[in-house]
């Protein structure tokens, strides 16, 4: 499955659970996670989506570390099974 298709399913499933899901595009700061998820309780989660065989770039690893250093919840999900698990467990982050 293509990353674009994974992103579409991710967004649709989380919106069905009452979350806001935004595409994170920062032209001046490359390597940021694909999506920002905001739960109905105000929790903010950063998510990088990859195919099952996807690989993080060095820049993506650096950006994820920066977010985590600032005590932000940042995730990397590989493929549809991990997306489904994340969505099924979103209540843990509310």
Feature locations, PLM:
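Catalytic phosphate/metal-binding cores of nucleic-acid and nucleotide-processing enzymes, i.e., regions
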Residues: 1-94
């Amino acid at each position: 499955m293509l990353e674009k298709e994974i992103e579409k399913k991710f967004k649709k499933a989380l919106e069905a659970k009452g979350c806001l899901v935004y595409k994170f595009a920062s032209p001046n700061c490359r390597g940021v996670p694909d999506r920002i998820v905001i739960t109905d309780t105000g929790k903010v989660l950063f998510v990088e989506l990859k195919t099952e065989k996807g690989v993080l770039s060095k820049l993506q690893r650096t950006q994820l570390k920066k977010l985590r250093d600032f005590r932000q919840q940042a995730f990397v999900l590989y493929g549809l099974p991990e997306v489904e698990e994340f969505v099924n467990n979103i209540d843990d982050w509310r």
